[in-house]
C-alpha cells in the first residue's frame, strides 16, 4: 500500500521530523481566524505601504491560520506558501530571519499537501498581495501521498468520484456544489417549518417494501431471522401518521432502489416527502411553486437558468393533462392513444419494450417516457395520470380512469410527484391485489400487498395530499450539474481495482508545484 516511490520519499521526511523531535501528526492548534476572514479584515492594508522588508512586528495584531499547503516557492532563506482552508487560499511569507533554524527543517520536509499552522501578522507584498508574515510555523499533518498537480493528475471522471476527498482538495468548484446542496436542503427545511410542517423520521428497514414502484434491496435481520427491505419510499409510514392525527408532516431522508444507474439515477438517493391533511393535489401544485420561489429568493438565483445547455425560464409554469401532452408535445395521434391495441402496435413499431401483457395505463406511460418527457424543458405539471400507474393516488371524481395526480418536469427530467391520496381502504386493497398479480406476472417493480397499511386506512385517513421531490435532481438543476454523481458526495460505482494503485500510477504529481529559485 505504501510501496510507491513518491510515498516512500515522503515517509522518509516524516521520519526525519520524528528524529528532530517534531510530531508529524500534532493535535493542538492556535487558529484565530479563517483565510477568508483574514483577507477581509486586513484588506485595507492594500491601500497602504507594501514594503515587506521593514520590521513590522510593532503594533501588529498576531493571527494564526491553518490549512493545506497548495504551492511552495523557495527563495534561498525565504519562501512563499499558498495555504488553503475551507474558506479560501492565503499566501504566507516565511523567512529564516523570523523562524530561525526551524526554517532549515521546514525547507527539507515541507511539501504540497501537508497541513500546517502559521502564526504571524498581515502585510502586503511588493507585488500587492495581502499575505501573512510568518513568525511561527508548525506542521500539523504530514501528507505521505502526493496530490495531483492541479487537476491534471486526476482527470479520470470515475477516479474523481472514487476519491472524492482528493477531488474536493484540488477542485474548488466541486466543493462549492456541495455547499450549495447543503444550502438548498437547509432552505427546504426552513420553508416547511415556516409553513407549520413537522419533520418526522420513519423506518429505513421495512418488512414490506412499498410507497413506490421499484425493486428493493433485501437484507436479513439475524436476531429476528427475517428478511428486511431497505425502504424504497417512506410514503406508507408517513400516511399512517396522518391517520394518527398529524396534519402536516415531512421527512427528508434517504431512499434505496435496486435498479440501474445512469446520469439521473443512483440506487441511494435523497428525497423529501410531505403530506398535508385536508388539502388536494391542486394545493400542492401551488405549494411547489411557492417552494421554488422561496429557494430562488434565498439562494439569490435568476429566474432564467442554464441546465445541460438548456435555458429554463422559471417565470413561466405550465399545467397540461397526460393525454393532451402526448398529443400536443409528443406528436401522437389521438386515435392511437385512445385505443389500447392501436397504441401497442404503434409502440412496437417504434421498437419499444412493450407486450400484450401490459395494461393500457402502462402503455401510455411508455409512450410518455419516450415521446414527451425529454421535451418538457420549462417547469411543467403533468396531470390526469392513468389510474393503472398510480396505485396509491385518489381516483378523479369526474373520470375514474385517471388519478388526481401530477408530476413536475423541468429540464426534461421528473423533479416531483404528488397526488391527492387514496384513502378508501377497499379501493386500496383491490389495487394492491392488482399490483400483486402484476408482480406474479413478472413485473419486478410492482408493489407488494401491505395489509397493515390497508388496516390503517380502515380507521379513517382524512382527505390528504402528498408529494415527493428528489433532492439530488433538484441540486443538479440548480447547480447545472450534468450527472447525479456530481451532486452526491460518494455515489455508487462499479467495483474496480484498488484506489491506491490508481492514484499512485499518475505521473503528474504535486512535486512539480514546489518551485525553487536561487
UniProtKB/Swiss-Prot annotation:
Q: Which InterPro entries match?
A: Aa-tRNA-synt_II (IPR004364), aa-tRNA-synth_II (IPR006195), aa-tRNA-synth_II/BPL/LPL (IPR045864), Lys-tRNA-ligase_II (IPR002313), Lys-tRNA-ligase_II_N (IPR044136), Lys-tRNA-synth_II_C (IPR018149), NA-bd_OB-fold (IPR012340), NA-bd_OB_tRNA (IPR004365)
GO terms for biological process, alphabetical? lysyl-tRNA aminoacylation
**Positions with a binding annotation for Mg(2+) 1:** 407, 414
Which reaction does this enzyme catalyse, per its entry?
Answer: tRNA(Lys) + L-lysine + ATP = L-lysyl-tRNA(Lys) + AMP + diphosphate
Q: Which cofactor does it need?
A: Mg(2+)
Could you tell me where this protein is found in the cell? Cytoplasm
Source superkingdom: Bacteria
State where Mg(2+) 2 binds: 414
Could you name the Gene Ontology cellular component terms for this entry?
cytosol
Alphabetized GO MF terms: ATP binding; lysine-tRNA ligase activity; magnesium ion binding; tRNA binding
Alphabetized, the UniProt keywords read: Aminoacyl-tRNA synthetase, ATP-binding, Cytoplasm, Ligase, Magnesium, Metal-binding, Nucleotide-binding, Protein biosynthesis
The record's PROSITE patterns line, in alphabetical order, gives: AA_TRNA_LIGASE_II
**Known EC number:** 6.1.1.6
Write down how the cofactor binds this protein: Binds 3 Mg(2+) ions per subunit.
For the protein in the UniProt heading, the enzyme class is ligase
* Similarity comment: Belongs to the class-II aminoacyl-tRNA synthetase family.
Record note on quaternary structure: Homodimer.
The protein depicted here goes by the name Lysine--tRNA ligase
Q: Which organism is it from?
A: Helicobacter hepaticus (strain ATCC 51449 / 3B1)
This chain is encoded by the gene named lysS
